[in-house]
Amino acid sequence: MKDLRTLAAYALALLLLATFVSYSRSAPMGSFQRRNWTPQAMLYLKGTQGRRFVSEDRNEGDLYDTIRLESQSQNTENLSISKAAAFLLNVLQQARDEGEPY
C-alpha cells in the first residue's frame, strides 16, 4: 500500500513537471506580440492614462505614447491649513448669504 502511494506521488509529480514544461515552451518568446487590436481593446488600452497610440516598435520611444496632462496647479503659493480653512469658510458664508431671501 505504501509503494502504491509513493508510485502515485511520483506519477503526479512527473505529470505536473511535464505540464509545466509544455506550457513554458508555448509561452511567447518576445516581450510584445504583434496582433490585430480591436477597437474595444484600443479603448481598454487608452484607459485613464491618456494613451492614444500603442507603438508596435518598442524603439520609437514616448513621442506619441502618452498625452502630457497638467495635473498640478500653476499657483506656486503654498497655503497653510488655517488659510485654506478660512478661505473655505468665507466661500461657504458667501454662498449662504446669496441664497437667503431679502
Curated annotation (Swiss-Prot):
Modified sites of kind Glutamine amide: 49
Record site: Cleavage: 35-36
Tissue-by-tissue expression: Expressed in the anterior hypothalamus, ventromedial thalamic nucleus and medial longitudinal fasciculus of the brain (at protein level). Widely expressed. Expressed predominantly in the spleen, kidney, liver and testis. Expressed in olfactory bulb, pituitary, telencephalon, diencephalons, spinal cord, optic tectum, cerebellum and hypothalamus of the brain.
Transmembrane segments: none
One of the GO biological process terms: regulation of sensory perception of pain
Keyword Ligase included in the entry's annotation: no
Gene Ontology CC: extracellular space; transport vesicle
InterPro entries per UniProt: Spexin
Compartments, as annotated in UniProt: Secreted; Secreted, Extracellular space; Cytoplasmic vesicle, Secretory vesicle
Propeptide residue range(s): 27-35, 50-102
GO molecular function annotations of the record: neuropeptide hormone activity; type 2 galanin receptor binding; type 3 galanin receptor binding
Induction: Up-regulated during female seasonal sexual maturation and after ovariectomy. Up-regulated by food intake in brain areas involved in appetit control.
Record keywords, A-Z: Amidation, Cleavage on pair of basic residues, Cytoplasmic vesicle, Hormone, Secreted, Signal
Main location: secreted
Signal peptide boundaries: 1-26
Keyword Signal found: yes
Domain of life: Eukaryota
Family: Belongs to the spexin family.
Function: Plays a role in the regulation of food intake and body weight and in reproduction. May also play a role as a central modulator of cardiovascular and renal function and nociception.
Miscellaneous note of the record: Amidated and nonamidated form of Spexin-1 had similar effects on food intake/feeding behaviors.
PANTHER family: SPEXIN
Record protein name field: Spexin prohormone 1
